[in-house]
Amino acid sequence: MHSARFLLAATLSIGFVSAQTCDRACLKTTLDQYLNAVVQHDPKSAPLFAGFRQTDNGVVVRPGTGTWQSITSLGKVQRSYFDPVSGQAAYLGLIEEGQATDVATLRLKIEDKKITEAEWVIAREGAIGPGGTNGGNLYNLAGFLAEPPLTRTVAANQRASRELLIAIANSYFDGLTTHDGSIIMAHPGCTRNENGTHTAGPNPNPDAAKGKAKGGGGDCTSNLTNFSVALISARRYPIVDVEQQVVLGMGIFLRKPGVKQLRNLLAEWFFVEDGRIRNIWASMFYPTNDLPVPNWPPYDANLPFPAEFAAPPASPAPAAVPGRGASK
């Protein structure tokens, strides 16, 4: 009798989990519904959970405000990635806010076919840079158009496991904080594109810089000695798209004590081939010192910039390497 009851309970439990699972097709449909609702400025047309929560660059906004009002259309580059295990979907590409075009990452969490979370990381032209002045951020629309993120389906026998993909992505953050590129699990010549600016590896479209810093020195493991980051806090890997071999890593770059640069909140996309990073794309912004970021659980690193990190330097800080120290 007890065995029969256990089997019945287990069967019902499996059925319940199956009913709640959102596969790739479900995630894609939900992501499309949300993006269409945002463009239409109509939260009611998206399947939002009653307790839905959204942040725009770390700031909580109510449905119908923030990006719900400002985004007028999606841009020419639109990429989508899905993680049925975590129940999350993401967008990497361009968005239009009136006459402005931005580089953006969007993360959605879906539970029981309802959107419970939305997180935007948006790079806008003319935004505040690491030095605290407007227009100091990396931004290159032409570079993003010329070097768009990949979309692909990797053969099953060539895919790294979910666990290995996360470890590969985390090795990049470990390499940055230890200032040792040999720790990073990456191919020689791995590339990096930040807010459309090519900052590491061979540049497939050097003319796209249009007079801006062309970057591309070394590769994604190079020039870390003077990288002005003491800690990458609040590391998260919400999207692990095993089918496309893509990982979304998110974190906060905290500067070395005495370095007068703002923190950096990043959405860093890792594209993996044969168990190593081949390409990186990132959208990012520089939060002011009083803004709690990333403003998502577990909230461990959601503090304003610590005073000891923001203190004026006793002596000039070492020169930062363009594209990493100066820009990130």
Question: Predicted regions span which residues?
Answer:
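Sec-dependent signal peptide recognition
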Residues: H2-A9
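C-terminal and inter-domain tail/linker signature
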Residues: A19-K328
